[in-house]
Structures are given as structure tokens and as C-alpha cells.
Amino acid sequence: LQVYEGLPASGKTKAIISEMDRRRSLGDQVMLILSNEHEELTRRPDGREGGRMGCRDSTKKFQIDRVIGTAEACEWLAEQVAGSLIVFDEAQYFDSKIVPAWLEASERGVDILVGTPSRMQLKALNGDQYDLKKLEVMCSCQKRNATRVMYSEDLTYPTHLCDRC
């Protein structure tokens, strides 16, 4: 079980797509799952099965396999086989009830990759074994790692700020 965390525009989705591409190139089954429980994802033109998840790097895209709710995701995960990679990007849009299904699938040998979990999901993991990949980005002052972002007119590229800026 791998968990990717970081501020917006820190490279989480790019890193996730790179890992999905790597695993698919090895011949592994790779599936990308998004939540249908929040309009932030489903109102996007590509936020559907067969759509393409992208990031700020226009060369990085990956086809979305399923757009489903938490209950369906839990049932679906129970059917997945060892050695496959199942990715939940923007995972914070799933209910925290999905966490036991992630853990159970992981224990069966299914590789689970979780991008941007909610605080409740992290709390539900409760110290269970997972590999945390925390992506850092420099503050705009270039002296320290950013701890927050600020959006102005551009909602795609936020300004990264540290505690002192």
C-alpha cells in the first residue's frame, strides 16, 4: 500500500502516472479508479470511465478505468487479483470506509496506490503498514519547503509558500 501526499502542484499525479506507466510496461494489470461522490471530479469533461487523467505535464496522461462510489469500490476491490496495481487518485473524495478494503486487498497481494487521501482516511489507516511518498515543493522564496499554497487568478498553478512567506 503506497500513499502519495503533497501540496497541490507538487507532482503527485505526475509521479502516480509515471508509476502506472512503469507497471503497465512490465505487463502488469493497472487500473485507475476515481470517485463519483464529489462533483469536483465528475463535472470535469474527462472525469468519466474512458476519460484521461492528466497533470500539469501535458505528456503524462492515463485512462480512467472506473468512476464509482465507495461501496462499489469496496466490493470491486474484493475481486481483484494479486500482482495488479489499483490506483485511487484524488482518494479524499471516497468515504473513509474504503480504508479496510485497501488494507484487505493489499494483504492479498494487490498493489494499492492512494493519491491524496483525506485526514480521516489517514486516521483510519491508524499506523498500518503503508509506504508514504510525501512530495515536497520549494516555496516561492526558494529558501524552504512550501507548507501551503495560495491561488490568485490562476487556479492551475498556485503560488507555493512557506511558513515565513
Task: Kindly give the residue locations of the regions a language model identified.
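Conserved P-loop
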Residues: 1-80, 120-127, 154-160
